[in-house]
Amino acid sequence: MFDDFVNGVVATVEGMKVGNPDDEGTDMGPLSSVEARDDAIAQVERAVEQGATLRTGGTALEQDGAWMAPAVLTGVTREMDAFKEEIFGPVAVVYSYDSIDEAVELANDSSFGLSGSVWGKDTDKAEQIARRLEVGMAYVNEHGTTKAGLPFGGVRRSGYGRELGRWGFGEFANTKLVRVAK
């Protein structure tokens, strides 16, 4: 099952159109800078040096700018930098697991906690799993959706507090206390 899933992820990633984000058929645009692209590529290369398997991508594309072929890594272990660090680039790290408890424990074994997603046909079960993730934003069958009325923010080294929605109003207010002792 794992190999079939990974093959599907690889096929999807290899079918993505990387290009001008203003073009309707584009799936992914460039990174924010050439430096950001080079950092992401270096993290992929370091993961491979440490024993991970690069299934596709992870290289600079031959055009001016911060373009990168999206990557898929497998075989990343807890000892590797790719497990411990955030990769700010188009890199999917796919893990195998034997039980839901193991998957949740693996997902929560991080210094970070911005967001996570659970995908499945049984949305009730997926929601139960999503509630166990130690993240600021947990999604079921989607990832990264933001709307003005939804809180945005993480936990641990991914931040504290929330932006947007009623939770974010306090970020833009200067509350003053005047207390008179009697």
Task: Please report, for each region that a protein language model flagged, where it lies by residue.
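Conserved C-terminal structural/oligomerization subdomain of aldehyde/semialdehyde dehydrogenase
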Residues: 14-18, 60, 67-182
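ALDH superfamily catalytic-core signature
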Residues: 1-77, 106, 140
